[in-house]
């Protein structure tokens, strides 16, 4: 049976033709602008947002230079100059009057002052070296998006010297053998990041893994909370020192405090959401909360926090930014910590039996 014919439909207005999209006028780039042009990447935008937010936190926590602080600084400077001038006059008077005891005291005081000035200069140099590492990361980030020639190799060779790698190192030789004259700065730095930089990164990963495992086992078996806190603090400071030394940074007192502050600030900025996202689902899936004791769970948490501290220290001490897929995650250390803790618990149960 055939379908009935549909009635005719009359439109009150005529159909309008489809409108073509309005295109913006073309823009011509010169050679200088084209050299610095690179496509937008979501991960780069995320890094810029994180850096901007971290800068806001740093600015908020940094004490403002008030008038009273400037007056105190000027007063201390004037007092120091007066002490030095008085010491010089004292030594001169003792020399004229042949008061050898007073002269010996003045010389001893002068040696102490010179030693203090030398310590301040050394601390300033180490602190400047830590700040210079952040500038080197910015330079490396620019070179990774540059199409120029000639700057990448010189920059990478300087990084190799800072890391203490001699010309006979196998990784450095592989990198030099892979270079060609036609490669631009981006390709040269990327090759260095893939062939040479992992040598130091793997050593830092082993340090983080060992410190995290020691923190986990210590918290799991120790009955004293005060001992736990002291041990974790000592291990974390030692971990930061060793990671900084691996990347060629010599830490002094103030530079160590600054690096530790930056690490804690970075962790606070990232928040606990990343820790919950990477660890929480795995713990729930394996039902570890039902099988591990409270002390064991605290040990795993302390170990993961130590690992996170080490990862952030790596990020601040590395001369190169992380490439895609290179940044270590807590999941890389999670299974190892859980396995070591389970083995320790099994051994303790067997000894008890």
From Swiss-Prot:
The chain crosses the membrane at residues 71-91, 101-121, 214-234. Its main location: membrane. Pfam families: DUF697. GO terms for cellular component: plasma membrane. It comes from the Bacteria. Disulfide bonds: none annotated. Keywords: Cell inner membrane, Cell membrane, Membrane, Transmembrane, Transmembrane helix. The keyword Membrane applies. It is a multi-pass membrane protein. It is found in: Cell inner membrane. Belongs to the UPF0283 family. This is UPF0283 membrane protein Spro_2618.
